[in-house]
């Protein structure tokens, strides 16, 4: 079994929850893309929604860079720093939970960032949608795009790195 952990911000835990539901065999999803690849091959050890910088630092025993923007209780970086922070988080998550695959997401101003760290490789990419957390622009469109893009990348990784086919 391939173990997966997610620590998500702008995707609100939706990536991990989707993987978990498929891994558990939810019948409502049995016709969805990726179901047969995940079911019986993947287990989710943790799926977290953590917008708070302090909570992430405390849980993963790490220090994140200062936010680029002030935004209520949440961290908010520009796209360049989102990419760095997503990668930091996935590395710390993988180390802390000893999982095969760690997925993290974070987005402030820009397209956001998705990091998928496997036993062999590191994948770092953005959504296709510009959003601005501070101004509330395109937040849900960016989120939906990122969830879909990350899930598709996850399935491709299972195919190519772990040789799991439908």
Swiss-Prot record:
InterPro entries: HcgF (IPR009625). Belongs to the UPF0254 family. This is UPF0254 protein Mevan_0254. It comes from Methanococcus vannielii (strain ATCC 35089 / DSM 1224 / JCM 13029 / OCM 148 / SB).
């Amino acid at each position: 079994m391939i173990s997966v952990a997610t620590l998500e911000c702008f995707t609100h835990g939706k990536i991990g929850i989707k993987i978990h539901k498929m891994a558990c065999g939810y019948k409502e999803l049995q016709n969805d893309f990726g179901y047969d690849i995940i079911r019986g091959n993947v287990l989710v050890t943790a799926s977290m929604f953590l917008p708070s910088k302090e909570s992430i630092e405390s849980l993963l025993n790490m220090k994140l860079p200062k936010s680029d923007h002030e935004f209520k209780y949440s961290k908010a970086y520009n796209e360049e720093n989102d990419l760095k922070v997503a990668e930091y988080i996935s590395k710390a998550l993988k180390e802390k939970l000893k999982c095969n695959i760690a997925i993290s997401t974070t987005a402030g101003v820009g397209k956001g960032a998705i990091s998928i760290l496997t036993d062999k490789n590191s994948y770092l990419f953005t959504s296709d949608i510009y959003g601005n957390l501070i101004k509330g622009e395109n937040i849900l469109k960016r989120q939906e795009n990122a969830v879909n893009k990350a899930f598709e990348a996850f399935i491709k990784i299972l195919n190519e790195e772990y040789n799991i086919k439908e």
